[in-house]
Amino acid sequence: MAEITYPKAGHKVVAKGLEMQSDEKPCVISCGILRKEIEHLLEKGDIDVKAHFLSERLHNDYNLLDRALNGAVKKHRKQSPEGVIVIYGDVCLGFNGEMKKLIDKYDVVKVDALNCIDCLLGGKGKLLEMDPDHKFLFLNPAFIKFVEKIKGQTKEKTREMFSMLDGIVLLDAMGDLDAYQSKIDEIADHTGLPILKRKNIGLGGLNDVLLEALDRNQQKRSES
């Protein structure tokens, strides 16, 4: 777990007409899968927040992620008078409303997205527009590292695990995907999945998702 902030003397950021002093920042609690992209947005000054990242490995176990996320929200809610924004998807804790229960429990704001990939695409279910039947394996640099663990399985077993999918869709948000080509080829070979397409998505979708959540957080605070 790690927390970072990018203080900028005298700097102000405006999101949809809402102005915030740099020393009064909300805290975002995010999956580590989005760390590189969020840090880049912070460095550019597109968003102005404190950022706390949980390990992407927690995705392997709903219970571990639930405990870690509960602990992080509880801690940072007390320490962040400007509010907390959770950057996890609706289904990251399960498919029975578990994430909504956590958000309601602490009365904080969450990004409008199904999962991390949906965040990168712009949220609001855009993932389902691209993959309505859940037939694609989406890979960006963070997910390439995450999926690489399948190499511990035999090729036969791995291909059986992924046999319900049609293929791989590559997502390049940072313009660095070419550096991972050998790893992409290894994953394609091990899973038996063809590479169907590559989308150079940039960071605009993620930035929009974050600004919309920051806007809702500010409105929530102004109404309280």
How would you describe each model-predicted region?
Residues F95-K149:
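Long, charge-dense
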Residues M130-D185:
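A conserved mid-domain beta-alpha-beta active-site/ligand-binding segment of alpha/beta enzyme cores
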Residues A2-G45:
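N-terminal basic/disordered segments at the start of proteins
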Residues A173-S224:
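C-terminal, charge/polar-rich interaction regions
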Residues D48-D66, K197-N200:
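A short beta-strand-loop structural module common to alpha/beta enzyme folds
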Residues V28-K36, L58-H59, I87-G97, I117-D118, ...:
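Gly/Ser/Thr-rich loops at beta-strand to alpha-helix junctions
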Residues Y62-H76:
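Glycine-rich, highly charged phosphate/nucleotide-binding loops
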